[in-house]
């Protein structure tokens, strides 16, 4: 894989993680607006957000296996989210 392709895949992976974090923010916001929010579910989503943010902060352009895993795992999910 050439350097430009590595950076492209890295950027795609980071963006996918950010889309997922934003998606969980929306879910949390919607749940919090309910008359009786499910606090347990909110906490699960917050934990997931934290995990995704941590993955992003630790991700390196040279971590090609981690980048591939993120893109394979979150690619279909982020596409579905973006389609709404």
Give, region by region, the residue ranges found by the protein language model.
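N-terminal acidic leader/helix
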Residues: 2-35, 61, 78-81
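Amphipathic, hydrophobic secondary-structure cores in small proteins
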Residues: 35, 39-44
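Amphipathic alpha-helical coiled-coil segments
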Residues: 50-69
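Long amphipathic alpha-helical coiled-coil segments
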Residues: 64-82
């Amino acid at each position: 894989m050439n350097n430009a392709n590595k950076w492209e895949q890295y950027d795609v992976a980071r963006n996918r993680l950010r889309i997922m974090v934003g998606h969980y923010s929306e879910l949390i916001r919607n749940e919090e607006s309910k008359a009786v929010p499910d606090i347990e579910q909110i906490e699960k989503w917050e934990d997931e957000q934290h995990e995704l943010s941590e993955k992003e902060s630790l991700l390196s352009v040279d971590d090609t296996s981690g980048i591939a895993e993120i893109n394979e795992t979150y690619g279909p999910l982020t596409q579905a989210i973006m389609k709404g």
